[in-house]
């Protein structure tokens, strides 16, 4: 069985962040909570989410793989209002996920499930030389600046600085965040073992940060020509994204 109750606002944020990159996913449900991982159709990005049972007001779950049409779920969750209670319940007999919103009224939906099993995808255990933690709002603004110049972006760590830049045929954009020299405390953590530089598809970075709030803290793990790993939390739930670099000749 599976039945869980939570705040609809928090669940919406997790689903929106995940569905920005993938259309369907397998929820791996057990007594500890919900987890899921999936690759985007181009196999450029991997998304992983984890919602431990502690983030739910109530939670009952044994081992199930629940194949979800994320786009359908996203549209239903978008109908939530304010801090409505959200109840998710698996109907094994009808092979559906029931979604209920509770406030002064009760609204019910059901979603047909895919017959899928766990992909067994895991976020690779990669050792990164560098890590920066940055407010999401500042990172997103730097992406918007870079978008004016090119559709690729370079993330660089060097000399106590985190640099985001983009270069076109004629124009260039650069945003520099200096460690220990930021009155707005935009960088909350900076760990550098060696200089690094990698280039990424800008559209993917926009998608995986689209659902963040300005004050969310992004943990960004970097190395030269390595996939970038970005982590952040939503009220106790954890989101992890891995994006392959663009290898320049």
Swiss-Prot record:
Assembly behavior: Homotrimer. The subunits circularize to form a toroid; DNA passes through its center. Replication factor C (RFC) is required to load the toroid on the DNA.
Function field: Sliding clamp subunit that acts as a moving platform for DNA processing. Responsible for tethering the catalytic subunit of DNA polymerase and other proteins to DNA during high-speed replication.
Species in which this protein is naturally found: Methanococcus vannielii (strain ATCC 35089 / DSM 1224 / JCM 13029 / OCM 148 / SB)
Family classification: Belongs to the PCNA family.
UniProt gene name: pcn
InterPro entries: DNA_clamp_sf, Pr_cel_nuc_antig, Pr_cel_nuc_antig_C, Pr_cel_nuc_antig_CS, Pr_cel_nuc_antig_N
A family per Pfam: PCNA_N
DNA-binding keyword on record: yes
Entry keyword annotation includes Nucleotide-binding: no
Xref: PANTHER family: PROLIFERATING CELL NUCLEAR ANTIGEN
Keywords tagged on the record: DNA replication, DNA-binding
PROSITE patterns reported in the protein's UniProt record: PCNA_1
Name of the molecule in the record: DNA polymerase sliding clamp
UniProt GO BP: leading strand elongation; regulation of DNA replication
Domain of life per record: Archaea
GO molecular function, one term: DNA binding
Lineage, highest ranks first: Archaea, Methanobacteriati, Methanobacteriota, Methanomada group, Methanococci
């Amino acid at each position: 069985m599976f039945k869980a109750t939570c705040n609809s606002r928090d669940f919406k944020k997790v689903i929106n962040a995940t569905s920005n990159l993938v259309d369907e996913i397998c929820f791996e449900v057990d007594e500890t909570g919900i987890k899921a991982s999936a690759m985007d159709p181009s196999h450029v990005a991997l998304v992983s989410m984890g919602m431990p049972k502690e983030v739910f007001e109530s939670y009952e779950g044994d081992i199930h793989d629940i194949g979800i049409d994320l786009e359908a779920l996203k549209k239903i969750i978008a109908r939530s209002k304010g801090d409505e209670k959200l109840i998710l319940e698996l109907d094994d007999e009808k092979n559906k996920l029931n979604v209920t919103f509770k406030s002064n009224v009760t609204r019910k939906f059901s979603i047909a499930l895919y017959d899928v099993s766990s992909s067994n995808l895991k976020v690779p255990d990669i050792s990164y030389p560098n890590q920066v933690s940055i407010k999401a709002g500042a990172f997103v603004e730097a992406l918007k600046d870079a978008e004016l110049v090119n559709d690729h972006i370079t993330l660089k760590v060097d000399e106590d600085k985190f640099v985001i830049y983009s270069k076109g045929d004629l124009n260039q954009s650069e945003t520099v965040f200096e460690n220990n020299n930021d009155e707005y405390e935009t960088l909350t953590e900076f760990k550098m073992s060696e200089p690094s530089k990698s280039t990424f598809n800008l559209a993917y970075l926009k998608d995986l940060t689209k659902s963040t709030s300005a004050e969310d803290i992004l943990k960004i793990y970097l190395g030269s020509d390595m996939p970038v790993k970005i982590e952040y939390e939503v009220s106790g739930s954890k989101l992890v994204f891995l994006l392959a670099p663009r290898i320049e000749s």
